[in-house]
From Swiss-Prot:
Disulfide bonds: none annotated. [2Fe-2S] cluster binds at C62, C135, C212. Transmembrane segments: none annotated. This is Dihydroxy-acid dehydratase. SUPFAM superfamilies: IlvD/EDD N-terminal domain-like, LeuD/IlvD-like. It is an enzyme of class 4 (lyase). Keywords: 2Fe-2S, Amino-acid biosynthesis, Branched-chain amino acid biosynthesis, Iron, Iron-sulfur, Lyase, Magnesium, Metal-binding. Belongs to the IlvD/Edd family. Pfam families: ILV_EDD_C, ILVD_EDD_N. GO terms for molecular function: 2 iron, 2 sulfur cluster binding; dihydroxy-acid dehydratase activity; magnesium ion binding. It comes from Renibacterium salmoninarum (strain ATCC 33209 / DSM 20767 / JCM 11484 / NBRC 15589 / NCIMB 2235). The lineage of its organism: Bacteria, Bacillati, Actinomycetota, Actinomycetes, Micrococcales. The gene is ilvD. Its cofactor is [2Fe-2S] cluster; Mg(2+). The active site is at S489 (proton acceptor).
């Protein structure tokens, strides 16, 4: 019987920095007895314990591969000399919860995931982790957990779905993704598409397992995981069903044990330079606005000083290169075909736009990883050359002004107008705007203002994909500006500004906008203003009170009490 397993001495890192308390000595006999029941033999108590945290479920195709991949990780941990222990956490499907009460819970799930992984890892004193995720909020939730725990960790993405294919009534044939269905709903409601074609699109959009295929939030965060150095190089782009994913899973299991041997922890990797690399890659791909929210939250957990201003500072230097959906023509599978994320990273590194000395989960630097992979050049079509970009600056911008003194976020990659000015149409929450659009009350040139959808006021900072999809489907995508203290889906297209801070419930200027007020957005100057006299605005504040809280019990009530501004990443604490 193994009762004692000696710790390492000298300068060599302890490969079991946390689990000795449950494996070593007489007092650990009860814990060892429990561990024997789940498969430990005498020789296993000397091995590092690796938590394999999986957000697998059967609710959404995004996570279907994770059961298979977790088992491959387990094999890799064994091969590396560790003992793997799989445990689960939740995941919410944004695609299913979109446009109704369920979306209040989406961003909340990010915190639940991070908290639940922390809880298991801390309670069981597990030494290291491999964190598997497939849907929008589970990716940042896992990365937040890694940063918070600061143990040896590797992140692994489930992979994206293959595009669907549809043939419409008029003979048109095209690839489709989930976002096409949201836009088809709007087109059908506006009489621009038949119910038959809507049905055809519905049946085609999800041909199998994997996350939504464009450069939407899940794929953006997968690219960020790789750019941060928290995922194995080349692991973000292969589709979910591709067996290369099993190889990456096995290697991730081996890698985390090697990180323990070398004493490398998450915060050794997740430095300010790593976050700057992640922002640069996001800008080059034209990634989701949600990346801003999530990177701020992950950086806070890593104790890295990341501010909204960093996104503009970096974005002004980085060209937008990815011709990717929702605004472009291609999907993540196409990125994989031309070499994956390393192709973009090498191009940026060669141009002096990345920190090549940033450490990664391989134990090597970013530059060393790219030299070993030797990725191909940018193909020039899916990923444009640096001297022939889609836009000269990055795909995201932070705006500030009298309407958003705390900041707002816009995906400039799809913003066709440099300057937009129009009269406000104000709605308390999303449903009112949907009803007005259906009734034909929203016209070209309007600025649709949806408020009380912020982190605290929603609560949960819902994504506005239902209304943006409906606006585009109605043929108004280039003619109506939508702004909100809520969020937008990574699949949103059109003139959209989100994350307006302070939010309405906190008496931000958005709370005092009235129908007919002129609002002006100037993208080149990154300004965002309410063109109302200051004296008039002050008069509107007299006697003002926010809308009453919608939820007084349960997780949403707790969340509303704890959550901070979107300008700080909507973190809780």
């Amino acid at each position: 019987m193994s009762v004692e397993t000696s710790s390492e001495t000298g300068n060599k890192p302890d490969i079991k920095p946390r689990s000795r308390i449950v494996t070593d000595g007489i007092a650990a006999a009860p814990a060892r007895g429990m561990l024997r029941a789940v498969g430990f033999g005498d020789e296993d108590f000397a091995k590092p314990q690796i938590g394999v945290a999986s957000s697998w479920n059967e609710i959404t195709p995004c996570n279907l591969s994770l059961d298979r991949l977790a088992k491959a990780v387990k094999e890799g941990v064994h091969a590396g000399g560790g003992f793997p222990m799989i445990f689960g956490t939740i995941s919410v499907s944004d695609g299913i919860s979109m446009g109704h009460e369920g979306m209040h819970f989406s961003l909340v799930s990010r915190e639940v995931i991070a908290d639940s992984v922390e809880t298991v890892m801390q309670a069981e004193r597990i030494d290291g982790s491999v964190l598997l995720a497939g849907c929008d909020k589970s990716l940042p939730g896992m990365l937040m957990a890694a940063a918070r725990l600061n143990v040896s960790s590797v992140f692994l993405y489930a992979g994206s779905i293959m595009p669907g294919w549809v043939k419409l009534e008029d003979g048109t044939e095209k690839d489709v993704t989930l976002i096409d269905a949201f836009e088809a709903v709007g087109a059908c409601a506006a009489g621009k598409m038949s119910v038959g074609d809507l049905d055809r699109i519905e049946r085609a959009i999800c041909p199998g397992e994997g996350a939504c295929g464009g450069m939407y939030t899940a794929n953006t965060m997968a690219c960020i995981g790789e750019a941060l150095g928290m995922s194995l190089p080349g692991s973000a782009a292969p589709p979910s069903a591709d067996r290369r994913r099993d190889m990456f899973a096995h290697r991730s299991g081996e890698a985390v044990v090697e990180l323990l041997r070398r004493g490398i922890r998450s915060r050794d990797i997740m430095t300010k330079e790593a976050f700057e690399n992640a922002i640069a890659v996001t800008m080059a791909f034209g990634g989701s606005t949600n990346a801003v929210l999530h990177l701020l939250a992950i950086a806070r957990e890593a104790e890295v000083d990341l501010q909204l201003e960093d996104f503009n500072r970096i974005g002004d230097k980085i060209p937008h290169l990815g011709d990717l959906k929702p605004f472009g023509r291609y999907v993540m599978n196409d990125v994989d075909r031309v070499g994956g994320v390393p192709v973009i990273m090498r191009a940026l590194l060669d141009a002096g736009l990345l920190h090549g000395d940033a450490l990664t989960v391989t134990g090597k630097t970013l530059a060393e990883n790219l030299e070993a992979i030797n990725p191909p050049d940018l193909d020039g079509k899916i990923l444009r050359a640096l001297d022939n970009p889609i836009h000269k600056t990055g795909g995201l911008s932070v705006l500030k002004g009298s309407l958003a003194p705390g900041g707002a976020v816009v995906k400039t990659a799809g913003f066709d107008a440099e300057v937009f000015e129009g009269p406000a149409r104000v709605f308390e929450r999303e449903q009112g705007a949907l009803e007005a659009l259906k009734a034909g009350e929203i016209k070209a040139g309007d600025v649709v203002v949806i408020r009380y959808e912020g982190p605290k006021g929603g609560p949960g900072m819902r994504e506005m994909l239902a209304i943006t999809g409906a606006i585009k489907g109605a043929g108004l995508g280039k003619d109506v500006l939508l702004l909100t203290d809520g969020r937008f889906s990574g699949g949103t297209t059109g003139l959209c500004i989100g994350h307006v801070a302070p939010e309405a419930v906190d008496a931000g200027p958005i709370a005092f906008v009235q129908d007919g007020d002129l609002i002006r957005v100037d993208i080149p100057n990154k300004s965002f203003d309410l063109l109302v006299d200051e004296a008039e605005l002050e008069a509107r504040k007299i006697g003002w009170e926010p809308l009453p809280a919608r939820f007084t019990k349960g997780v949403l009530a707790k969340y509303a009490k704890l959550v901070h501004s979107a300008s700080e990443g909507a973190y809780c604490g």
